[in-house]
Swiss-Prot record:
GO terms for biological process: 3,4-dihydroxybenzoate biosynthetic process; amino acid biosynthetic process; aromatic amino acid family biosynthetic process; chorismate biosynthetic process. Involved in the third step of the chorismate pathway, which leads to the biosynthesis of aromatic amino acids. Catalyzes the cis-dehydration of 3-dehydroquinate (DHQ) and introduces the first double bond of the aromatic ring to yield 3-dehydroshikimate. This is 3-dehydroquinate dehydratase. 3-dehydroquinate binds at E47, W48, R49, R83, R214, S233, Q237. Pfam families: DHquinase_I. GO terms for molecular function: 3-dehydroquinate dehydratase activity. NCBIfam families: aroD (TIGR01093). The keyword Lyase applies. Its EC number is 4.2.1.10. Pathway: Metabolic intermediate biosynthesis; chorismate biosynthesis; chorismate from D-erythrose 4-phosphate and phosphoenolpyruvate: step 3/7. Keywords: Amino-acid biosynthesis, Aromatic amino acid biosynthesis, Lyase, Schiff base. The keyword Amino-acid biosynthesis applies. Homodimer. It comes from Klebsiella pneumoniae subsp. pneumoniae (strain ATCC 700721 / MGH 78578).
């Protein structure tokens, strides 16, 4: 049995799968226009993909935008994510800028969760996790492989490593090259949940063929999935209304 993780008015826990919807836009006007459309869409949590924001390298502009987004989303929990280019993001930042951006967001009082990518300097990861927790912010630690699905043992190793580094919610997303790859991800999730997990997990197989992994989290052990209202942020994401319908049928 894993420990539940509560963020504002939602709880990540075994046997439940929450729906996260990405908020994407290059300009603040575009972002706010999209944000208003998400409030009534039925998402449990919103992820601002700040790597899509044209002014992401200007800290003051990011924080100003964040304040506007926080107001627009009302009570909805907010996940702050800068996705690096090597893991499927839109923009690249230096390591120094990446950690500074996330630290500022965590300390702002405007976000509820930040995303930290696993494949970074360990000392900087640990320091950022500590800063986030000191500010009352939860941490998703993530890894994304847009080219392949690693071996089951490797997926489990990465998720366990995230736990060891202090992640509240370990996350991995992988790309299948065959139906067997989808089964590999699901088997890794189930094994991790049953043998090693001390907290909720977030896992998915991407692309169209990986879609089954996005709707079976309650069965295999993924506590959050990603749906869309408009533009998707990763291949294989499903429109939120269809996603919830299928999840309800399967449950």
């Amino acid at each position: 049995m894993t420990n539940a993780v509560t963020v504002k008015n939602i709880t990540f826990q075994e046997g439940e799968t929450l729906i996260c919807v990405p908020l994407i836009g290059k300009t603040l006007d575009e972002i706010l226009g999209n944000a208003h459309g998400l409030v009534d869409a039925g998402a449990d949590i919103i992820e601002w993909r700040v790597d899509h924001f044209a002014q992401v390298r200007e800290m003051a502009q990011v924080m100003a935008a964040l304040a506007e987004i926080r107001g627009a989303l009302k009570a909805l929990p907010l996940l702050f994510t800068f996705r690096s280019k090597k893991e499927g993001g839109e923009t690249e930042l230096s390591d120094e800028a990446y950690f500074a951006l996330n630290r500022e967001a965590a300390r702002s009082g405007l976000v509820d969760v930040i995303d930290i990518e696993l494949f970074n300097d360990e000392a900087q990861i640990r320091a950022l996790v500590d800063d986030a927790h000191a500010a009352g912010v939860k941490v998703i630690m993530s890894n994304h492989d847009f080219h392949k699905t690693p071996a089951q043992e490797d997926i489990i190793y990465r998720l366990r490593r995230m736990q060891d580094l202090g992640a509240d919610l370990p996350k991995i997303a992988v790309m299948p090259q065959s139906p067997q790859d989808v089964l590999t991800l699901l088997a890794a999730t189930l094994t991790m949940k049953e043998k090693y997990a001390t907290r909720p997990l977030i896992t998915m197989s991407m692309g169209k063929s990986g879609g089954v992994s996005r709707v079976t989290g309650r069965l295999f052990g993924s506590a959050m999935t990603f749906g869309t209202v408009g533009q998707a942020s990763a291949p294989g994401q499903i429109a939120i209304a269809k996603l919830r319908e299928v999840m309800d049928i399967l449950s």
